[in-house]
């Protein structure tokens, strides 16, 4: 059975604004996705299916295998696909302080803001406990975040020959209301799928995400926390790049001192030229090393646990 998904609900043009929707990101080389949901919903397996590789630990377990927010990256359709897996931070028994801490880390990993927030819920019995966890999750985001949310229903294979529309007609009313709240944006996933089936459901999900991004005017979700995080990240990235630049200068000075001391004691001009050539090679090698460090400075900052937001 092919993966099924609904179309994206229409958003009236006059109801959109930069403040409500976020910041324009048309032509972005990135597509940033956050996986949200209760422990055991299948977030990590879903992330692996989307990325096409095992980036996150996953398994059948009553306790969350994912302990902190983690990021995986791959390339899809010419874009850098960034997927952030979250632990069961919205489980009803998780303290709000722990939830807030991981939200802060998630913000750092997806700054300047995610294009899609995927709420992962397994098909089957949608319990009162699961509904409470969902409401806790939604309460952590402003209402505008709904425009960036997609309901991702895992364990699609449990449907067997049952049509998804028939299933949803008999689903709990609160689940039907959730689909309506997400403007009828939902997608089915079989995390046991492989090969062509896995690629097809991934394609359909990411097509739905891109369709939603277009409906949102090419914008990504942002709020004051994201704006604050981006400011912190940019500042720390600049500091790290400056540190690497100064470190390169110190390394060049050290290399020059050592070689010039050697060259000064040499009487053979040919040997002097050899040492100068060797010194230039070391200069070039060090420049390449530090250029790569500067290029990766932002990623280092994003992955650090030292980003704190007020």
UniProtKB/Swiss-Prot annotation:
The free-text tissue note of the record is:
Primarily expressed in spleen, thymus, heart, lung and intestine and, at lower levels, in liver, kidney, stomach and muscle. In the spleen, expressed in periarteriolar lymphatic sheets. In the thymus, detected in the medulla.
Q: Which residues form the IQ domain?
A: 233-262
Chief location of this protein within or outside the cell: cytoplasm
Chain intervals for the UniProt region annotation (Disordered): 1-25
Enumerate the UniProt keywords alphabetically.
Answer: Coiled coil, Cytoplasm, GTP-binding, Nucleotide-binding, Phosphoprotein
- Gene3D superfamilies found in the cross-reference section: P-loop containing nucleotide triphosphate hydrolases
Q: Where is the AIG1-type G domain?
A: 28-230
Would you name any one GO CC term? cytosol
Q: List the InterPro entries hit by this protein, alphabetically.
A: G_AIG1 (IPR006703), GIMA/IAN/Toc (IPR045058), P-loop_NTPase (IPR027417)
Annotated region G1: where? 37-44
User: Is Hydrolase found in the keyword set?
Assistant: no
- The entry marks the following residues as binding GTP, namely 37-45, 58, 155-157, 191
Q: Where in the cell does this protein reside? A: Cytoplasm, Cytosol
Segments of this protein annotated with the region G5:
190-192
Query: Any idea which GO molecular function terms this record carries?
Result: GTP binding
Q: How is it modified after translation?
A: Phosphorylated at very low levels in resting splenocytes. Rapidly and transiently phosphorylated in response to splenocyte activation.
Database matches in PANTHER family: GTPASE IMAP FAMILY MEMBER 4, GTPASE, IMAP FAMILY MEMBER-RELATED
**Stated role:** During thymocyte development, may play a role in the regulation of apoptosis. GTPase which exhibits a higher affinity for GDP than for GTP.
Q: Which family does it belong to?
A: Belongs to the TRAFAC class TrmE-Era-EngA-EngB-Septin-like GTPase superfamily. AIG1/Toc34/Toc159-like paraseptin GTPase family. IAN subfamily.
Listed name of the protein: GTPase IMAP family member 4
Task: Report which gene this protein is encoded by.
Answer: Gimap4
């Amino acid at each position: 059975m092919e993966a099924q998904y609904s179309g994206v609900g229409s958003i009236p043009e006059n109801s959109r604004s930069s403040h409500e929707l976020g910041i324009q990101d048309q032509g972005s080389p990135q597509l940033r996705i956050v996986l949200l949901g209760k422990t055991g919903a299948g977030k990590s397996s879903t992330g692996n299916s989307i990325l096409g590789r095992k980036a996150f630990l996953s398994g059948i377990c009553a306790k969350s295998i994912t302990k902190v927010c983690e990021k995986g990256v791959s390339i899809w359709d010419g874009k850098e696909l960034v997927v952030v897996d979250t632990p069961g931070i919205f489980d009803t028994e998780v303290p709000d302080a722990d939830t807030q801490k991981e939200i802060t880390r998630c913000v750092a990993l997806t700054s300047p803001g995610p294009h899609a927030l995927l709420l992962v819920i397994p098909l089957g019995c949608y319990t009162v406990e699961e509904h409470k966890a969902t409401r806790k999750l939604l309460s952590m985001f402003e209402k505008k975040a709904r425009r960036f949310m997609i309901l991702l229903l895992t364990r699609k294979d449990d449907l067997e020959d049952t049509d998804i529309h028939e299933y949803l007609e008999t689903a709990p009313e609160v689940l039907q209301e959730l689909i309506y709240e997400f403007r009828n944006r939902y997608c089915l996933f079989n995390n046991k799928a492989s090969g062509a089936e896995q690629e097809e459901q991934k394609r359909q999900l990411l097509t739905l995400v891109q369709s939603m991004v277009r409906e949102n005017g090419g914008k990504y979700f942002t709020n004051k926390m994201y704006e604050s995080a981006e400011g912190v990240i940019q500042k720390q990235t600049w500091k790290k790049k400056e540190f690497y630049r100064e470190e390169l200068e110190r390394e060049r000075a050290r290399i020059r001192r050592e070689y010039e001391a050697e060259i000064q004691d040499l009487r053979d001009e040919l040997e002097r030229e050899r040492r100068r050539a060797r010194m230039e090679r070391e200069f070039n090698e060090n420049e390449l090393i530090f250029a790569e460090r500067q290029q990766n400075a932002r990623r280092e900052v994003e992955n650090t646990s030292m980003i704190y937001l007020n």
